[in-house]
Amino acid sequence: QEWADVDFWGNELTLHASEHKLDNERHDVDMGNVSVPHFGVHLSRKDFDALKQRLKDNGTKYYDEPYLRFKGTKYEQETFFVKDPNENILEIKTLTANPD
């Protein structure tokens, strides 16, 4: 199969297989730099913590360890990056100051 649809926390993410790989680079942001390209998803604190525990239980290594962004503001969020089995980079984050 050359493609797959994945339930990406209530959103459809369609993945296509390709021989061509994009080069990763890092772009400067507020707290350092992030890998580009990447996919991102905002999770509730409950789902975020459950996913972190699942990754830990499975021995998954972080691409970028969890850290806080916008610390002390209403936009404060915890975020981390992982690679999927096809080397796609995923950013997972949750708001910490005002989860609603």
Range-by-range predicted roles:
Residues 8-10, 31-36:
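Short connector loops at helix/strand junctions that flank enzyme active sites
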Residues 21, 96-99:
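A short acidic/small-residue loop/turn micro-motif
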Residues 34, 39-85:
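Vicinal oxygen chelate
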Residues 1-3, 69-70, 96:
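Conserved beta-strand edge residues that scaffold enzyme active sites
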Residues 24-29:
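Short beta-strand/turn micro-motifs at beta-sheet edges
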Residues 1-20:
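Core segments of cupin and vicinal oxygen chelate
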